[in-house]
Amino acid sequence: MSDHAVNTPVHAARAHGHRAPRAEFYVYFAVILLGAFPVAFVSWIVSTIRHRRLPKRGPFASAWFDAKAITPLIFRA
């Protein structure tokens, strides 16, 4: 008889664990952050002019959020 509980998704997730980010991750993060900042800055200015009030997040926070969301997607692919 075989044990079907050995390779369940819960056990597989625990076996891989959380990997610490490496230097390559930080390089990609920095490049994406530098690319996202000008776009976020222009978007922030347009939003400020259009709505006549400051957005909740500033341009750097917005670029940081975008880089934080995009970089892990590169390594999952």
Swiss-Prot record:
Keywords: Bacteriochlorophyll biosynthesis, Chlorophyll biosynthesis, Photosynthesis
Transmembrane annotation, as ranges: none
Family the UniProt entry places it in: Belongs to the PufQ family.
Domain of life: Bacteria
Keyword Lipid biosynthesis on entry: no
Protein's job: Required for bacteriochlorophyll biosynthesis. Directly involved in the assembly of both the B875 and B800-850 pigment-protein complexes.
Protein name stated in the entry: Protein PufQ
InterPro entries reported for this sequence: PufQ_cyt-su
One BP term from GO: photosynthesis
Native species: Cereibacter sphaeroides (strain ATCC 17023 / DSM 158 / JCM 6121 / CCUG 31486 / LMG 2827 / NBRC 12203 / NCIMB 8253 / ATH 2.4.1.)
KW Mitochondrion (keyword) present: no
